[in-house]
């Protein structure tokens, strides 16, 4: 059993590293590891942060593996092997990173073995990741990865399209939630569960903006 858990964690780490290698500027960044030094000059306003989990339950907010906000020519990361929100969520290998360059900001967050129950709705996934990027002068972009997502034991067909919504009692689950601001800042939430008046849970969130 220990070997199975170790292999699963290695697979998650490999998938995350492979995804980061597709980014022009963040190819050398590894979530939960040492980030490369950014260039020495950045112009404009920088927005960047990431978190593995941000859960607000009955007005109480918990953040797991959150980077906080980056500044110009900055790099932040956060990771833990296991984490959870009491009576709501458990997960493994929670990681987040954000980095700013002279003309680009990249951020990403991920976790594995997600199991959560929000207002009676059970949600599981083997792997969840969000990534966002913006190059100065161009609109930001991002994507999400969700592996073996199930809601109340029923497998969910993840389309890959932004803002795929699934109704649940009292609210909805939004998959690959994406917003692009007027300045091009990209915000990507891989999984967003909202139950009105009870809970607002975001799993794997990444923000990247430079203007």
Q: Where are the regions that the model predicts?
A:
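Conserved binding-pocket/active-site segment within a compact domain
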Residues: 27
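Bacterial N-terminal signal peptides that target proteins for export
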Residues: 3-14
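Extended, solvent-exposed, non-transmembrane regions
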Residues: 30-211
